[in-house]
Amino acid sequence: MRHLSSPPWPLLLLLLLSSFTSGESSLSAEKNKLHTGGLSRQSFPKGFVFGTATSAYQVEGETHQDGRGPSIWDAFVKIPGKIAKNATAEITVDQYHRYKEDVDLMKKLNFDAYRFSISWSRIFPEGSGKVNWKGVAYYNRLIDYMVQKGITPYANLYHYDLPLALENKYKGLLGRQVVKDFADYAEFCYKTFGDRVKNWMTFNEPRVVAALGYDNGIFAPGRCSKAFGNCTEGNSATEPYIVTHHLILAHAAAVQRYRKYYQAKQKGRVGILLDFVWYEPLTRSKADNLAAQRARDFHIGWFIHPLVYGEYPKTMQNIVKERLPKFTEKEVKMVKGSIDFVGINQYTTYYMSEPHPTTKPKDLGYQQDWNVEFGFAKLGKPIGPRAYSSWLYNVPWGMYKALMYMKERYGNPTMILSENGMDDPGNVTLAQGLHDTTRIKYYKDYLTNLKKARDDGANVVGYFAWSLLDNFEWLSGYTSRFGIVYVDYKTLKRYPKMSAQWFKQLLKRNNK
């Protein structure tokens, strides 16, 4: 039997070289995955803010302790079948106790700011009146620690979570009293936290609140006409419009309080956060172009038009007629110009077309009033790759068009891109979850289009990724993961994904 000796040295050298180069190439492949596509902090103007975003109900947990009152979502999640796997947000990712760990993560990843929301019912368990000082103490701890770590707080006052007490007292957002109660709550927050918080937002996605809560009833408080959803009460033809009217007035009243009593001294600003799906005409036909414009008017225009011009879009006035509330002269003065900046939550784009055949609907409702057909493909070709959520397609050019639309149609207000991101399924393993190269591509492509819009004159001054953490994703519960940090829901341990490392690389400062 021939003796099996070591390979001769030239062969050994060859083997060593090949193993070195293959190791080097796998290292280089990993580096390529973190490649920022030419983007860096220096691609954006000095002072451009990069942050991440979450909301109180989705990340805090501790819903029943320390004096917090229930919100409409605490009641809604208890209805069997409303939330995937009947999940609740009682613990979620427990930021209430782990906020220091989360702020430390933001710092390590080179972010500048954190957009969080304050739970109205944690401050005022009954919606008004008695203050829960333990809740106030929590937000003081969170804000103080952010400031200590050099993370700028962006505080949102309302993210879907109306105090349940107000829903029971006067039907919540359907009651005119909510305008004063919200302004009182906002003023308390300015007075209490405004020495450190200089960036305030009144409402997150108020359109979603009105449409999903009162037109099809799939969100809390679950009201709609029977023709449009499984609701026990509601009126899709009128309630979404009444709710929106009250939301706009509540926003304007809160801004008025800030400008009158706090802005000069605190030197902060107040805005609102609006969701904006870009609607692209399916064809070049006049009918499809009109359908796309109708969709934009009923979507973003419903809120931004009154805030900039003091009235609802003409399209809406002509279609909704007497079902659309009107602003008084005094209200117009309060509403018009009531934004120091506007946040745009931009995730995706859809095709819009004129429905065929066009028939007069039997039942009236907000979505029905659009009279459009949604499309996610053209000539069999999808508009973009789909994320896990059925509504979310990766269409980066829609970001550019949405921002340029705001520039051209609404006087180029100061804007922050206040949410942007994509999800993976909730059941991905840790290894799969960490290797989120699709998310990196999503962020790279969308940020490239944001930069293009900025270069073409859109006044965008900040960008917030949704979300810092995997968390409670409303109807999807824990079956959808939007975070750049993976959370093990059993242990609540945080694991930064590749996308988090990508942001760390992107946001390196020159002196690092």
UniProtKB/Swiss-Prot annotation:
What enzyme category does the UniProt record give? hydrolase
Question: Which InterPro entries does the UniProt record give?
Answer: Glyco_hydro_1, Glycoside_hydrolase_SF
GO terms (BP aspect): carbohydrate metabolic process
| Cross-referenced Pfam families | Glyco_hydro_1 (PF00232)
Which residues of this UniProt protein bind a beta-D-glucoside? 58, 159, 204-205, 347, 419, 466, 473-474, 482
Q: Where in the cell is it found?
A: Secreted
Q: Which cysteines are joined by disulfide bonds?
A: 224-231
Record field: catalytic activity: Hydrolysis of terminal, non-reducing beta-D-glucosyl residues with release of beta-D-glucose
Which residues, if any, are the signal sequence? 1-23
This chain is glycosylated at 86, 230, 427
Q: Does Calcium appear among the keywords? A: no
Q: Which UniProt keywords apply?
A: Disulfide bond, Glycoprotein, Glycosidase, Hydrolase, Metal-binding, Secreted, Signal, Zinc
The record's active-site residues are 205 (proton donor), 419 (nucleophile)
Annotated EC? 3.2.1.21
Q: How does activity depend on pH?
A: Optimum pH is 4.5.
**A molecular function GO annotation:** esculin beta-glucosidase activity
Query: Hydrolase: present as a keyword of the record?
Result: yes
User: Highest taxon of the source?
Assistant: Eukaryota
**GO CC annotation terms, alphabetical:** cytosolic ribosome; extracellular region; plant-type cell wall
Subunit structure as annotated in this protein's UniProt entry:
Homodimer.
Q: Which family does it belong to?
A: Belongs to the glycosyl hydrolase 1 family.
Role of this protein: Hydrolyzes p-nitrophenyl beta-D-glucoside, p-nitrophenyl beta-D-mannoside, cellobiose, 4-methylumbelliferyl-beta-D-glucoside, laminarin, amygdalin, esculin and gentiobiose.
Q: Quote the protein name from its UniProt record.
A: Beta-glucosidase 44
Q: Which organism is it from?
A: Arabidopsis thaliana (Mouse-ear cress)
Name of the gene: BGLU44
